[in-house]
Amino acid sequence: ELQACRDGYIYIHDMSARRDTMNCCLFDVEHVLKGGFEMGNLWYNEPKTLNVAFDVIGDIVLSAASQQYGGFTVPSVDLLLEPYAERSYKMLTEKYTRLGLDADTVEKEVMADILNDFEQGFQGWEYKFNSVSSSRGDYPFITMTAGTGKSRFAKMATITMLDVRRKGQGKDGHKKPVLFPKLVFLYDENLHGPGKELEDVFEAGIRCSSKTMYPDWLSLTGEGYIASMYKKYGRIISPMGCRAFLSPWYEKGGMEPADETDVPRFVGRFNVGVVSLHLPMILAKARQESRDFYEVLDYYLELIRKIHIRTYAYLGEMRASTNPLAYCEGGFYGGPLGLHDKIKPLLKTATASFGITAFNELQELYNGKSLVEDGQFALEVLEHINEKVNQFKKEDGNLYAIYATPAENLCGLQVKQFRKKYGIIENVS
């Protein structure tokens, strides 16, 4: 394994961190907030107003995100904030009514106050998540998704979040959009299309996109896996951080639905780590040694499988006290656990990923053509990897997944590793 890593045939992401904690997640903030929770040996009551909810959620996110090394996502933040806006509405209406104001003035003042709370809250998050480092010493990769809430306050949440990002932060005349939280717009053509009830929310997203690189747009009603889960079950799969999407875990049946009424669960689940294949190097090795490519590929797939099995076993021995908000206060599905309980029961719904990179270079090395010109071999390889990973899932009972590794930095390393072993090949290295 170490030699495979050194040579570059596989790459273990976050090698040191993966032995301490999990990777990325869809954190269930709603479950943590409901009824109150404990954080840092202090009891927090559930917020009674919107502005307090913003403060408390910000604290939860920074605390929990510091206990992991991958992307931290708060899914459907518009629906998360909606009940706290309703509480503020009720409280403010009673307050202004007691002052003897007429009903129209009360409504106007209350809605203005709630809008201001949303603006200040989202602005506060932007400052907090980009200037307050976590206890790990870095700035966590925080993502928030929104866009499907239909109530007036859910819509107000999404629109205000997008407007705050569009306007940017900083000195007058020098404002620029911040990095975190990364925003993802959940697009449903039946809600956001022309003349539909959330068209104004869609327009706010377009205005934001016209000025910034945000939000990312995730189609819930297009084609593919994400859309299929939404169309069949009405369940949204938000990305964990940047672009990692969870495989389904069914509430009754686990990896497979138990019956027609079984539904998948995504919120509150996480990933335990990624190990990526270096496919062009594996093909080059097979050719140099006059061996069957798939035989060599299977060797490295088995290597990754063993690493994942050990990761599940190692993490399973850890205690819930290593991340109390996640394991003990409801942030992760399957809890809450006691502080001294092992986290093994929660790992059954967690994914471990086989990363894939450089398919274009693989195809170029195979026959000198790009994916656009041919691509058949690359597709066959991906189908083979998919079959093997599904086989491993059934045999091991672990929820393995395939991950298209972004490889922003890894790609440079992989080129150097390829050159060192196999030299410079046009359109490959």
What residue spans do the PLM features occupy?
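Conserved catalytic cores of very large enzyme subunits
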Residues: E1-K348, L365, K369-S429
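Contiguous, well-ordered alpha-helical segments that form the cores/surfaces of helical PPI scaffolds
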Residues: A352-L365, E383
